[in-house]
């Protein structure tokens, strides 16, 4: 429901929507309101937000870079962007969206929804783009995706935004190893839904015991390991 009301406000007021990078869960796919994720890379994030003169925060904090990078700003908004808080992280954000929409007369506005759109099924060499395209083509409706693909999955969201409706679970902190246990928990909680676990090999090595639990409990989890054998996230940060 919150996505619906946010979509009404976006259509009525001509504003853009964006989620924080570390959003725990988002509902995505065809027929739903598409909300892009704040990019991880500072320069890319600034490019995505430079058009905003005002930022209205709902159940989130001011967006800042993950690390304090040399010669890079921490704030992921332009310096002249005015920041307004509609609801803090401890307040009732969904109701705040409803109240704002009613106040502005947006309750009956037609919502712009994500149309169905799948990339062409690829062939040939596996890389970040081709793997993302394969995932998009096989993702079933109602799936829950636990995404800890890290460096190899940076393009996944673009490729999968037009898939059948699904839930996407993100890692929410700086440590890695959460993805496969998160998939296990999702499968226990929602036994009637398929779960897709996407994990980098650097992340997977910390919590391989998740596979044992999934087998023992006969959980409906499909695990994909991105085996680049390089711990690429660390190399990326060092650069």
Give the ranges of each region predicted by the language model.
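Redox- and metal-dependent alpha/beta enzyme cores, enriched for Fe-S-associated oxidoreductases
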Residues: 2-23, 140-143, 156, 229
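A short acidic, amphipathic alpha-helical/loop segment
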Residues: 2-8, 134, 210-213
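Glycine-rich, acidic loop regions that bind phosphate or pyrophosphate groups
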Residues: 4-5, 17-119, 238
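Thiamine diphosphate
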Residues: 12, 33, 155-239
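Short beta-strand segments
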Residues: 20, 57-59, 87, 148, ...
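Short gly/pro/ser/thr-enriched loop/turn and capping motifs at secondary-structure boundaries
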Residues: 23-28, 63-65, 90-93, 153, ...
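Structural motif
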Residues: 54, 144, 194-196
